[in-house]
UniProtKB/Swiss-Prot annotation:
GO terms for cellular component: cytosol; glycine cleavage complex. The glycine cleavage system is composed of four proteins: P, T, L and H. This is Aminomethyltransferase. Pfam families: GCV_T (PF01571), GCV_T_C (PF08669). It catalyses: N(6)-[(R)-S(8)-aminomethyldihydrolipoyl]-L-lysyl-[protein] + (6S)-5,6,7,8-tetrahydrofolate = N(6)-[(R)-dihydrolipoyl]-L-lysyl-[protein] + (6R)-5,10-methylene-5,6,7,8-tetrahydrofolate + NH4(+).
Length: 367
């Protein structure tokens, strides 16, 4: 690793657990600790703890905070109450995606945006560029926060053992500020990127650093493990959650990517609104579908998809599922071919191999 890679405040902590690190968008982060499969299974059946301190935090404050965010974001920010989080997209005028993110409402004039690590500067610049006449302060506070995610069916039990706050009262996509966890005050959000129940904890770097070991110690007897980026990707993919740069990008709209639930075309105008309305009215040119290999092989990001010799799209994410060993992927293809059960081909090392479109998500937790 070169010295140029950024490290999170937890780097020294997770190094103690045998982390194998990789360059992830300029950050030196753990791809795995034991193995991707073991960590994936732990999160599905018990719980895993992730360092997600590389994610960005941008604060928006001021009397025009709501109006500014309504213009900036695709979801309807007016619908969330204080203490509630909302998944949304930030779009360009052409409907392409600047980023997908979470909006946390701290107060009527105070919002926290959690953005993707690779997009922090781009998002911040885009927000400043579109501040216009709005009376708001936009503050990139990414360095002031660290963040960990405790994910899995045992997440609530483990977290509850460390705090007197009733965490069962924090419902999905709700959060509570100033929760004291073993003496460390943090924001606790019931949310995540795995398809499981879980919590994301935001706080000062020194507090989150201290909590990393304490949470793992508390969960050790229950089989809770440190988890890396490798299983974070297989978990989110299996659950049908998009990854910016693969399922979403400046050239892929939120409607094409299947996150139309985060786009409210009937609210007041927002950046990208007209382009997305036109897409919906004229029919989406492309759709994201699930694919499964018929022939032997594993679909990978960037592989081209063909129908009767004609290129119709490409794979956005693909892998062998750790749980079921199915060789599956997401592919963005011409809409006319997006019906379930349609056979097509993907090109792997110069060979065209058969795939079929299938239902997604590949995993849905039982409530």
């Amino acid at each position: 690793m070169t010295n140029e890679l950024k490290r999170t405040p937890l780097f020294e902590e997770y190094a103690k657990y045998g982390a194998k690190t990789v360059d992830f968008g300029g950050w030196e982060l753990p791809v795995q600790f034991s193995s991707i499969k073991d960590e994936h299974d732990a999160v599905r059946n018990r719980a895993g703890l992730f360092d997600v301190s590389h994610m960005g935090e941008i604060l928006v404050t001021g009397p025009d905070a709501l109006n500014f965010l309504q213009n900036l974001l695709s979801n309807d920010v007016s619908k969330i109450a204080t203490g509630q989080a909302q998944y949304t997209a930030m779009c360009y005028e052409n409907g392409g995606v600047v980023d997908d993110l979470l909006t946390y409402k701290l107060a009527d004039d105070h919002y926290l945006l959690c953005v993707n690590a690779a997009n922090i500067e781009k998002d911040y610049d885009w927000m400043l560029e579109n501040q216009h006449q709005y009376d708001v302060t936009i503050d990139n506070q990414s360095d002031a926060y660290a963040q960990i995610a405790l994910q899995g069916p045992l997440a609530e039990e483990v977290l509850q053992s460390l705090t007197s706050t009733d965490v069962s009262a924090i419902k999905f996509f709700r959060f509570q500020e100033n929760v004291e966890v073993t003496g460390h005050k943090v924001l606790v959000s019931r949310s995540g990127y795995t398809g499981e129940d879980g919590f994301e904890l935001y706080g000062a770097p020194e507090d989150i650093k201290a909590l990393w070991g304490k949470i793992l110690d508390a969960g050790q007897d229950k089989g809770v493990v440190p988890a890396g980026l490798g299983c974070r990707d297989t978990l989110r993919f299996e659950a049908g959650l998009p990854l910016y740069g693969q399922e979403l990008s400046a050239t892929i709209s939120p409607l094409e990517a299947g996150i139309g639930f985060a786009v409210k075309l009937n609210k007041e105008d927002f950046i990208g609104h007209d382009a997305l309305v036109a897409q919906k009215e004229n029919g989406l040119p492309r759709k994201l579908v699930g694919i499964e290999m018929i022939d032997k092989g594993i679909p990978r990001h960037g592989y081209k998809v063909f129908k009767d010799g004609k290129e119709i799209g490409e794979v956005t994410t693909g892998t062998q599922l750790p749980s079921s060993k199915r060789n599956v992927g997401h592919a963005l293809i011409d809409s006319q071919f997006a019906t379930i059960g349609n056979e097509m081909e993907i090109e792997i090392r110069g060979k065209q191999l058969k795939v079929v479109t299938v239902e997604t998500p590949f995993y849905k937790r039982s409530k």
